[in-house]
From Swiss-Prot:
<keyword id="KW-1133">Transmembrane helix</keyword>
<comment type="function">
    <text>F(1)F(0) ATP synthase produces ATP from ADP in the presence of a proton or sodium gradient. F-type ATPases consist of two structural domains, F(1) containing the extramembraneous catalytic core and F(0) containing the membrane proton channel, linked together by a central stalk and a peripheral stalk. During catalysis, ATP synthesis in the catalytic domain of F(1) is coupled via a rotary mechanism of the central stalk subunits to proton translocation.</text>
</comment>
<dbReference type="Pfam" id="PF00430">
    <property type="entry name" value="ATP-synt_B"/>
</dbReference>
<keyword id="KW-0375">Hydrogen ion transport</keyword>
<comment type="similarity">
    <text>Belongs to the ATPase B chain family.</text>
</comment>
<keyword id="KW-0150">Chloroplast</keyword>
<protein>
    <recommendedName>
        <fullName>ATP synthase subunit b, chloroplastic</fullName>
    </recommendedName>
</protein>
<dbReference type="InterPro" id="IPR002146">
    <property type="entry name" value="ATP_synth_b/b'su_bac/chlpt"/>
</dbReference>
<feature type="transmembrane region" description="Helical">
    <location>
        <begin position="27"/>
        <end position="49"/>
    </location>
</feature>
<keyword id="KW-0934">Plastid</keyword>
<comment type="function">
    <text>Component of the F(0) channel, it forms part of the peripheral stalk, linking F(1) to F(0).</text>
</comment>
<keyword id="KW-0138">CF(0)</keyword>
<dbReference type="GO" id="GO:0045259">
    <property type="term" value="C:proton-transporting ATP synthase complex"/>
</dbReference>
<keyword id="KW-0793">Thylakoid</keyword>
<keyword id="KW-0813">Transport</keyword>
<keyword id="KW-0066">ATP synthesis</keyword>
<keyword id="KW-0406">Ion transport</keyword>
Length: 181
């Protein structure tokens, strides 16, 4: 890997006067710079990105576990409600003569309330999962963008120096001088 890097560095110092070589003009070599920056970001950012994704995965799994615990609690509540329903049904048999319609209404209300509670908990679980997933995606995007920007700035700063600026300005002055004549 070091030899490949050294070969690209040595190619960058070849004279650009009418032969093969790298053009160090940043405006003319944008695809080359972008490919180098992307290569650096991919090479060095892969580990960080994997760590971020692993951490995010653990958080999401933790959220899923919490949601499953909430689901289990809802199931337990449902079982308690069913037990209560069975109790109400036995009482209904005892009081069938006196108030069958009122007991049936209570049964339906109990079933409806339990179903709504279970549905609300399921919606909460789904919303939590979606929120965590979106937050993870946004954090990964932000981290990749920051790393790409830092890599690009580092590459630009390492490639630009005062001698390069002086040569570029001199070349442009020469071109303008030729254009005026």
């Amino acid at each position: 890997m070091q030899n490949v890097t050294d070969s690209f560095v040595s190619l960058g110092h070849w004279p650009s006067a009418g032969g093969f070589g790298f053009n160090t003009d940043i405006l003319a070599t944008n695809p080359i710079n972008l490919s180098v920056v992307l290569g650096v970001v991919i090479y060095f950012g892969k580990g960080v990105l994997n760590d971020l994704l692993d951490n995010r995965k653990q958080r999401i799994l933790s959220t899923i576990r919490n949601s499953e615990e909430l689901r289990q609690a809802a199931i337990e509540q449902l079982e308690k409600a069913r037990a209560r329903l069975r109790k109400v049904e036995t009482e209904a048999n005892d009081y069938r003569v006196n108030g069958y319609s009122e007991i049936e209404r209570e049964k339906q209300n109990l079933i409806k309330a339990t179903s709504e509670n279970l549905e609300r908990l399921e919606n909460y679980k789904n919303e939590t999962l979606l929120f965590e997933q979106q937050r993870a995606i946004n954090q990964v995007r932000q981290r990749v963008f920051q790393q790409a920007l830092q890599g690009a700035l580092g590459t630009l700063n390492s490639c630009l120096n005062s001698e390069l600026h002086f040569r570029t300005i001199s070349a442009n002055i020469g071109i303008l001088g030729v254009m005026e004549e």
